[in-house]
């Protein structure tokens, strides 16, 4: 009986371990790169997985789909995904989510910039690769929570303005 219980428990825990290894998670949630009035690149990192799909549209119902690729990071199981969205309209709000196999993100939004000749006011925030600085481990949190968010609240109240591209 003890052998049977041990065999069952060993099988159960091996199964849980294998399932955990096969379940992808976001290492880095979706972020935007190289925005211009008619295209933008969406990137994200997962613990594993090949599929690189972005569903997008001008409403949260989405409706369009773009496919990209994924590459290994340092020859490990993590994958960085890249999908370019093209044919976008300038100065337009888009909604999107990313998919890698069974892993699906929340729905996010961004606004494409205007053409320079449009003479439209356009705000943006640029941040560099925020590597962990062991001398200042809370710097990114400080920049966002003590700088950017209080500024937006003082300028626009409790809502982010529509003309602020994210």
Name every feature range the model reports, one short phrase each.
Residues 21-166:
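Divalent metal-dependent phosphoesterase catalytic cores across multiple superfamilies
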Residues 1-24:
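Bacterial Sec-dependent N-terminal signal peptides
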């Amino acid at each position: 009986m003890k052998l049977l219980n041990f065999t069952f428990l060993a099988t159960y825990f091996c199964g849980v371990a294998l399932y955990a290894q096969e379940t992808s998670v976001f290492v880095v949630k979706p972020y935007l790169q190289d925005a211009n009035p008619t295209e933008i690149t969406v990137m994200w990192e997962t613990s594993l997985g090949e599929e690189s799909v972005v569903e997008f549209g001008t409403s949260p119902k989405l409706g369009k789909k773009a496919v990209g690729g994924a590459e290994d990071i340092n020859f490990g199981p993590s994958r960085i995904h890249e999908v370019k969205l093209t044919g976008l309209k300038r100065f337009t709000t888009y909604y999107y989510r990313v998919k890698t196999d069974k892993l699906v993100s929340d729905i996010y939004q961004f606004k494409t910039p205007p053409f320079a000749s449009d003479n439209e006011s356009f705000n943006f925030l640029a941040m560099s690769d925020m590597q962990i600085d062991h001398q200042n481990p809370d710097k990114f949190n400080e920049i966002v929570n003590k700088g950017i968010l209080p500024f937006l609240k003082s300028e626009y109240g409790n809502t982010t303005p529509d003309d602020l591209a994210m």
